[in-house]
Amino acid sequence: MSAISWNCRGLGNPLTVKALQKVVLEKDPTLVFLMETKFSVNQMEGIKGKIERQEGLVVPSVKCGGGLALLWKRTVNVDVLTYSPRHIDVVVIEEQGTRKWRFTGFYGHLETGKREESWKLLESLSNRSNLPWICMGDYNEVMYAREKEGGGVRPKGQMRNFQEAINRSRLRDLGYVGSD
């Protein structure tokens, strides 16, 4: 079982779609969580076919921004619990129902002033189930200054608020692979 999470910053560019196809072909993940698709539900149907993930849930973009999609292989059953423009929360059932776990794809607010709303959502999600849980996505914040490449210096208070939300949610930072 594997999952990838990718902030694609829009799927309107054919090169972005090709890059997504390449990653999915190489890694063959069971789950694919996409953020900032900037696509409607109908537009995402074409993407699902291109990456051979026919099952999924799409939260359409609003105007020209946002948009989430969680796509999965037919080899697993997925029960959708909740979703919003900031998250998709599901239970994954594998191996004829013998293994269950929870996956949350999460997309934190871009606006610094609204991040506290993101952290409250994260904490609320953490209390909804006792199943093993993985939460991945783009939180739009870093845990430590050393994780930030380019741009301005992150205020310590912002990082501390994120660290505290992660701790209160009983999550562990597993790091990431990829570019910013």
Q: Where do the PLM segments sit?
A:
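A shared catalytic/ligand-binding motif for oxyanion handling
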Residues: 1-180
